[in-house]
C-alpha cells in the first residue's frame, strides 16, 4: 500500500477542534496515534511516564512527541501520568479538561507487561498489570463519559492484542496468561460499554496491532526471519485508529479489529507521520 506524501497538520481535518487523550504516547504505537490525530486537527494530550530522554531504557519521550506535533503546526499538551496511580489518573483528565475543555476522544494504549507463568506470578506485578491494563481504561472512560454524554458524541478506543484470543492447547509457551487475561477483559469491557453508550452517540472500539516494529518489540528482538513478513507498519496502526475515531458512531461502535483489517475494509492509505 502506497504512503501519502502529506505529512503536515490539516487544521480542517476530520478531527478539527476535537480533544484527544492518548496514553502511552511517548513512543511506538501511542506516539504514532498522537501524531496522526494531530495531523487531522485534533488537540492532543500526550500522556506517558517518560518526560525526558534518559528516564527509560527505550527511546521516546512525551516532550519529543509534543515537540514534533507543535513543530508541524499542531496543538499538543504533555501530561506525565503513571496509570497505576489513582492520583495520576484523575490528574490526567483534569489537566486535559483544564487546558482544552471536554475530552472528545480517549485512546487507552498504555500497558505494562510481565511474562511469567501463573504459578510464579507475584501479586504485586499482577495488580500492577491489571491496574494499568484493565482498571485504568475503565476509570479513564468513567471520567470522560459525562462530558461525552452531555455533548452526545465521543470516541473511546482501546488497544488490545491477539493475546486476548484463547491459545492453542497443543502449542508450547508459558507466561502470557495474565497478559491475555487483561486484554480479553479489555475487549469485553469495550463491547459492553459500546452497548451501554450506543444511544448516546459514543463509539467504543478495540484495535489490535498485530506485530509492529515498536522500540519495545525491537529491544526484545521479537521480529525474526519467521515473522518479519507479517510486521504491520506503525503508520497503518495509526491510520486504522484514526478511522475508528470519527464518523457515524452507531455504524462503527463495538468493533474488535486488527489494524490491517480496517485498512483493507476502508481502503485506507497510511499517511507519512509528522
Question: Which residues are covered by each model-predicted region?
Answer:
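Short-chain dehydrogenase/reductase
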Residues: 2-100, 114, 124-125
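Conserved mid-core segment of classical short-chain dehydrogenase/reductases
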Residues: 58-63, 90, 111-127, 168-175, ...
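Conserved internal alpha-helix within the Rossmann fold of NAD(P)-dependent oxidoreductases
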Residues: 136-141, 155, 165, 186, ...
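C-terminal helical subdomain
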Residues: 199, 206, 225-274
Amino acid at each position: 500500500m502506497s504512503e501519502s506524501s502529506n505529512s503536515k497538520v490539516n487544521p480542517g481535518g476530520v478531527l478539527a477542534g476535537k480533544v484527544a487523550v492518548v496514553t502511552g504516547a511517548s513512543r511506538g504505537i501511542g506516539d504514532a496515534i498522537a501524531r496522526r490525530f494531530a495531523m487531522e486537527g485534533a488537540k492532543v494530550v500526550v500522556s506517558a511516564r517518560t518526560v525526558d530522554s534518559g528516564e527509560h531504557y527505550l527511546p521516546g519521550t512525551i516532550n519529543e512527541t509534543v515537540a514534533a506535533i507543535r513543530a508541524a503546526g499542531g496543538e499538543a499538551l504533555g501530561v506525565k501520568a503513571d496509570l497505576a496511580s489513582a492520583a495520576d489518573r484523575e490528574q490526567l483528565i483534569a489537566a486535559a479538561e483544564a487546558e482544552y475543555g471536554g475530552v472528545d476522544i480517549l485512546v487507552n494504549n498504555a500497558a505494562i507487561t510481565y511474562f511469567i507463568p501463573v504459578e510464579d506470578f507475584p501479586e504485586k506485578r499482577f495488580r500492577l498489570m491489571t491496574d494499568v491494563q484493565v482498571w485504568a481504561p475503565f476509570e479513564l472512560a468513567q471520567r470522560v463519559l459525562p462530558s461525552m454524554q452531555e455533548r452526545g458524541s465521543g470516541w473511546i478506543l482501546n488497544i488490545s492484542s491477539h493475546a486476548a484470543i484463547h491459545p492453542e492447547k497443543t502449542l508450547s509457551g508459558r507466561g502470557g496468561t495474565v497478559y491475555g487475561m487483561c486484554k480479553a477483559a479489555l475487549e469485553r469491557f469495550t463491547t459492553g460499554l459500546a452497548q451501554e453508550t450506543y444511544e448516546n452517540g459514543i463509539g467504543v472500539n478495540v484495535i489490535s496491532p498485530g506485530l509492529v516494529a515498536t522500540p519495545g518489540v525491537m529491544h526484545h528482538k521479537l521480529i525474526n526471519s519467521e515473522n518479519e513478513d507479517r510486521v504491520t507498519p506503525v503508520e497503518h496502526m495509526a491510520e486504522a485508529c484514526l478511522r475508528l475515531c470519527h464518523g457515524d458512531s452507531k455504524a462503527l461502535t463495538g468493533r474488535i479489529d486488527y489494524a490491517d483489517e480496517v485498512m483493507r475494509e476502508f481502503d485506507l492509505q497510511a499517511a507519512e507521520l509528522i
